[in-house]
Amino acid sequence: MECQTLMMLNDLEEHVIEGNGIQIHYVTKGEGPAVVMCHGFPESWYSWRHQIDSLAEAGYQAVAMSMRGYGKTSAPQAIDAYDINHLVGDVVVVANHLNQGPVVVAGHDWGAPVAWFAALMRPDLFRAVACLSVPYTGPIGALPEGIDLNGLMAQAAGPDRDYYRLFFQEPGKAEADLEADIYKTMRGFLYAISGDALRNGDISEPFDGHFPAGQAMTDQLVSPDELPSWLTQEDLHFYVEEITRTGFRGGLNWYRNINRLPAITAPFLGATIEQPSFYMGGSTDLIAGNTPEAISAMQQALGDLRHCEIIEGAGHWLQQECASEVSAAMMAFLEGLN
């Protein structure tokens, strides 16, 4: 696995371009119609490593971005530099720079809402959308004065529980917790909400993001005795190096813009994504709204949903845990576009 990973990395082309007020880093492999992939929290372009290889071999240009706040892409300090307009704008910059015309956009975790809204906002640039682990919810419209999403999440959690998205809100607090031991944090994140943690009996039920009030986020991240088969020590060290480069602040700032999302996307209320769409999730993944109710709502909200699949026993890190299944399904979806 280590040799294969190194060979794959050596075949990549790295790019750093200027646009949308920042430097944007992305990697490419292969030639053909482009598929632009957006990662989530707390990850890297590297989370798409298996799909990069599969796409290139199948005759596509795999394009994996380092999202704003991560890796070699700029990491502005200002919280409002991470709202959905900025995030979608970065993907638009990359799509335009490829100079291919409309491209396919894909996303996982936080990268999924970015991909969904990119497809909604710019159908002229994105001809199809494929997302993992976070189903499409669409614009909900501006909330009434005095009501915000953080308040609704706190109300749902109750007085005795915290919620990871709320824990991430206070600047400095979450950074101190997550950055105290980045290796331990990344090892815990990548294992605790994977399907392996439940399968191995290290947790008794899937983690839905809630935990006892007063505890730290890292207290919830059970760490394995041995890494799961889909994650090597080399993989883990790459993630640690990428996060060490920037710290967690940029990634956390995505969460600190949740309250702004309804108003920013309100002009698109009632609009639908009509391009061909694709969704895959894991049956044990409850961290980001991957519930049966959300899947059902998504199926009603997408105009041309061509693939919707929940992989039994899989957790949150779908394109790594189930690399071959995800790659095969994506290839079939892409082939259907031609």
Residue ranges of predicted features:
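Flexible "cap/lid" subdomain of the alpha/beta-hydrolase fold that forms the substrate-access gate
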Residues: 3-12, 70-106, 110-306
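Short acidic-hydrophobic surface loop/beta-edge motif
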Residues: 13-19
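A short loop-to-beta-strand scaffold at the N-terminal edge of the catalytic core in hydrolase folds
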Residues: 19-28
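Conserved HGGG/HGGXW glycine-rich cap/lid loop of the alpha/beta-hydrolase fold
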Residues: 27-75, 94, 108
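Glycine-rich phosphate-binding loop signature in dinucleotide/nucleotide-binding domains
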Residues: 30, 98-101, 337
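Short, hydrophobic alpha-helix immediately C-terminal to the catalytic nucleophile
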Residues: 49, 116-120, 327, 331
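Catalytic active-site module of serine/aspartate enzymes centered on a nucleophile-bearing elbow/loop
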Residues: 305-338
